[in-house]
Amino acid sequence: MASSPSYIPYLCVAAAAFITTFLTVPLVKRLAIKLDAVDYPSKRRINTKPIPRLGGTAVFLGLVVACIVQIMGTWHLGWPPVLVPHPRLHISYPMLALSFTVIYATGAIDDIFQLKPKQKLAGQVLAALIACIGGLRIGVIVNPFAPGEIMLGWLAYPITVVYLVAFTNIINLIDGLDGLATGICGIASFTMFSMAVLSGRIDAAALSIALFGACLAFLHYNFNPASIFLGDSGSLLLGFALGSISLLNVSRTAALTSLIIPLIVAGVPIIDTFSAIVRRKRAHISIGQADKGHIHHRLIQEGYNQKQAVLLIYAWCIMLSAGAAAINQVEVPMRVLIFTVLAIGSAAFAKHLHLFEPVLRHHYNKRTHEDELVTPDDPAFKQEEQAAEERKEERHHRR
């Protein structure tokens, strides 16, 4: 493999992650039920029966075993070393492993004990800081306006922390339908694997293909009808892993294009998060207040069932990932053209789904005797939400 690319090590790493995750999910389900780490039906959740969460535990174990297989292959089978010096970074891989452990532990504790938002954010920041201290950071970028590079200095730390925390949360926020976050991360990780192989980053390639194997195995249990959810232990881990992989690739060249490509790959959850912020600001409510205006909610409201909605979002992700891969291989004029097409297409789909418009409800005004559309900041909205929930429970009891 030293002289020409061999995919046998990557296949072994992916297989190790797949098999481990596949075999441990049933054990994790029993553990989650025992610990009462269960998602019960509610007005914001799609599931109609209790589903165990904590699925990230199986994904985490899959990644751990995959890393062990890679290390053993390097020692005993002559595989090329993954933990090689980075051309721009001095990465401490034990510190990177510790950051993954911290982000998983944060999500797992939240799955079991329900952390406060600030506590969960603190865990994410800690994990990102550990990764930064371990050398995973954007220290320099190519100046897009003049020849040369821009050294970020101490700004590399806050910029990288914000980047990793943001990447972590965009996956967490879109985890709303069976198999949605898992499938999106599977598509993104495979795309990043192909880019890592082309750029010669064996560490990023091994980690991304391990993540792909774990996602593929978990999807067997998580696709509709799901028997287990990722939970925050999984969604936080997947988002953090994708962010870390993107930095391993991005930091190699520090070019503006290489900074944009991972954002295109993760375009769907980024659009979903950005539209949620705009939508809630327009409705005059806190950006942290949950609503039913996410992509998957809008598709369900359009009349699609869970499977159809998830498959449509998969198709959107594949389109963006294919575009990102193409941008990575062509010259500047074609890059601009591809990016423009992707941006216009995504904007048109977002507009069709009314992603940036406040969530509305019909409300019968007893004083005026008229049907009104109310936004979440109107007290009548909560009345209609409660009435809808009561009707849902009544239908459930009748069954």
Locate the predicted segments by residue.
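Membrane-interface capping segments at transmembrane-helix boundaries
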Residues: L27-R30, F349-N365
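Alpha-helical transmembrane segments of integral membrane proteins
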Residues: Q301-M319, I327-N328
